[in-house]
């Protein structure tokens, strides 16, 4: 009986870590759903709201590497619990704040604690499960997390409307604390899988070298230029864009936006398959960037789009947003195996920082061009031109990123094997 229980414990750890990975997506995307309520309650302008949205990415990016190091150095259950606790406290601060500065602190804490999400899943997977199961378990965790993102849009809006966002957030905080407590209390006697053990946590010179590696920094910069479709548009601006520009109702706008995350569930496997089929990861990255640019040109400059068309475009956008999987594969091929996880974390930090940059830039531009028109709730109403001026930065940055990758691939002659290497976090 005890042996059977011992075998189940790693599965339980993995399940609850994956559940938190989905949970943090729900908290992350809630700001976009509550945009009007937040602007009205705190009497802030769009620039301040853009700052609020971007604080999540600052916290997430800033803690990505420190949490990764702590997961290796200390008991991963304790590190995961503390990180989840930070997320929960940030959620409570976010919902109870009566001052905008406290709201910023709560959002920052949510981002910082959420950085443990996928890292803890990867740690549990590599610690307790055979190598042959790593890819499928990490893939399932990622898909599960994206299902949380899908739930965070339309279903969460329904919950907010029915119960109020205060009660809903308190409930989410309680659920998050419960997840963390269960992870902390699960004791596992299952022996760790024998893996190549490399201690990069104490090698400060290696960390410094990776941060100063021009190729990695260039890849991180170029990848960051292409994240605007997801972290800049879908996370916060898609819903008001569809509502005000294409006159979709609130439910249709929410559903269309959520399809980005549905598309991402399929995007990783599809792009990897195409990259292996064409024997060129480089080409698929370029194609994905071009397609994202085309999608935004259609969204911005078509005179009329219906619900079905916007839904299809957002689903396709989600597929092409998974170009990052191929970038991480390239990164892992450029460094020694023992450094791959830290190298990927370095590039991911840069990518996540661009989430803040896009939010800040777009909010400044759209506010600058705004004509002062507001609705009955005193929330700004933007024209098509306002949105075009702000959101155009996304396809422009995509083009710059594509050109940069073409230059990098040509200069470095990066060649990858036809099969995708497993990337560990």
Q: Residues of each region from the PLM?
A:
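Helix-breaking motifs and short loop linkers at transmembrane-helix boundaries and internal kinks
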Residues: 43, 75, 96-102, 130, ...
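Conserved MFS/SLC helix-loop-helix module at the cytosolic interface between two early adjacent transmembrane helices
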Residues: 62-101
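Paired small-residue
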Residues: 90, 101-109, 308-316
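Helix-loop-helix hairpin linking two adjacent transmembrane segments in secondary transporters
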Residues: 140-189
């Amino acid at each position: 009986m005890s042996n059977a229980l011992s075998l189940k414990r790693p599965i339980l750890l993995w399940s609850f870590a994956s559940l938190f990975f989905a949970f943090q997506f729900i908290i992350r995307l809630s700001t976009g759903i509550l945009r009007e309520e937040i602007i009205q309650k705190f009497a802030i302008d769009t620039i301040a709201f853009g700052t609020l949205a971007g604080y999540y990415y600052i916290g997430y990016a800033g803690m990505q590497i420190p949490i990764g190091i702590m997961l290796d150095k200390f008991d991963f259950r304790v590190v995961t619990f503390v990180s989840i606790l930070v997320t929960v406290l940030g959620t409570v601060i976010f919902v109870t704040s009566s001052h905008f500065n406290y709201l910023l602190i709560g959002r920052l804490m949510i981002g910082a604690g959420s950085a443990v999400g996928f890292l803890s899943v990867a740690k549990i997977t590599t610690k307790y499960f055979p190598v042959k199961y790593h890819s499928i378990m990490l893939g399932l965790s990622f898909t599960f997390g994206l299902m949380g993102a899908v739930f965070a849009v339309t279903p969460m809006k329904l919950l907010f409307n029915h119960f109020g966002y205060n009660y809903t957030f308190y409930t989410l905080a309680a659920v998050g604390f419960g997840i963390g407590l269960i992870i902390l209390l699960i004791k596992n006697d299952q022996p760790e899988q024998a893996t190549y053990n490399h201690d990069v946590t104490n090698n400060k010179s290696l960390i410094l070298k990776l941060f100063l590696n021009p190729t990695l920094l260039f890849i991180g910069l170029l990848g960051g230029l292409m994240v605007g479709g997801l972290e800049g548009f879908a996370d916060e601006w898609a819903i008001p864009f569809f509502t005000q520009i294409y006159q979709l109702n609130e439910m249709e706008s929410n559903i269309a936006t959520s399809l980005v995350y549905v598309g991402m569930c399929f995007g990783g496997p599809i792009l990897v398959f195409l990259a292996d089929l064409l024997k060129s990861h480089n080409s698929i990255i370029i194609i994905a960037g071009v397609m994202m640019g085309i999608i935004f040109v259609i969204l911005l400059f078509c005179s009329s789009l219906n619900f079905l068309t916007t839904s299809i475009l957002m689903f396709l956008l989600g597929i092409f947003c998974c170009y990052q999987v191929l970038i991480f594969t390239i990164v892992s091929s450029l460094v020694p195996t023992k450094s791959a996880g830290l190298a990927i974390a370095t590039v991911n930090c840069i990518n996540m920082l661009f989430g803040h940059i896009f939010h800040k830039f777009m909010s400044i531009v759209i506010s600058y061009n705004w004509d002062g028109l507001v609705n009955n709730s005193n929330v700004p109403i933007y024209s098509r031109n306002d949105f075009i001026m702000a959101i155009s930065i996304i396809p422009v940055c995509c083009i710059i990123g594509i050109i940069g990758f073409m230059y990098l691939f040509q200069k470095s002659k990066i060649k990858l094997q036809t099969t995708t290497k497993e990337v560990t976090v």
